[in-house]
Structure formats: C-alpha cells, structure tokens
Amino acid sequence: MERTDVKNNRTEEYSTGQIRCIEKSDPEYPQIMKQYSSMPAKLYVKGRLPDPKRRTVAVIGARMCSPYGRIQAFRYAKALSEAGVQIISGMALGIDSEGHKGALEGNMPTFAVLGSGVDVCYPKSNRKLYERILWENGGIISECPLGSGPVSWHFPARNRII
C-alpha cells in the first residue's frame, strides 16, 4: 500500500466514525481518568471504551516471559472475564497479549491501550489479536495521533492510561 493510500484510509476511518477522538470535556471520556491531572487531553478510540459500570482489571507484564507466565496470564484473564470483569492491557507480546486472549476466551470484551496511533497495529505480529479485539466488541485506545508509530517514550505514557 502506498503512503497516500494509507493516509486516505486513515482519513476515511476517522471521517466514518470508525475512529473517534474523545476530548477530556466530552461526556464519553472516562470519568476515572478525569480525576488525574496527568491524563491526556484527548483519546483516540477504535471500537469501544470499557464499560464504566463494570469492574476492570489490568493484565500487564513482561514481553520476554516464561511459558508458565504466559499460561498463568491467560488463565487469570479468562477466569476474571468469565466472572464479568473487563481486561485492559497494552497488546505487547508476552503477558499483555495472553491477557487479551484469555479475556476473549472468557467471552468478555478486552481493551488495548497502544503506544502508537490506534490505526497502527504494534507489534505487527499481533494483527489477528488487534482485529479480534475489535470484532469481539472491545476497543483500541491511544493518546497518540493517527499514524503515530511506536516510539520508546510512548510506552511509559501509555502505561498511565492502563
């Protein structure tokens, strides 16, 4: 895909409402985040935001983790999901990805907060997970503008949202 095609696709997603920009003053902006001054002025959202009436648990951890760690992250997220708890994570390789997969296996939406724009799947190897999160009524969330690639300083900032 050429660069102009990518830009046109992003513009189309945004203009058709597939991607929303939610400002802090918007009623849809998560109330819990409004309590903290360090939160971003706006969020970009593809899909849904977590339901504020449901409990939400973050499943986060190492990218380079043991097989045991992967299994446990998946199991905990699945059990929480089966109990009606929403899972939020960063969609990174390792523990984060297993948390999302466990939530989906437990039949609850899951929410990924990215260190890139919501239109940039990172890591690329998680494309199927990214698409499944959206397909299963979850959401992709970021404070990074559309088209922003993953850069090292985005990830600590992303973590405060999780």
Give the ranges of each region predicted by the language model.
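Glycine-biased, small-residue-rich flexible motifs in mid-sequence functional cores and linkers
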Residues: 2-5, 12-162
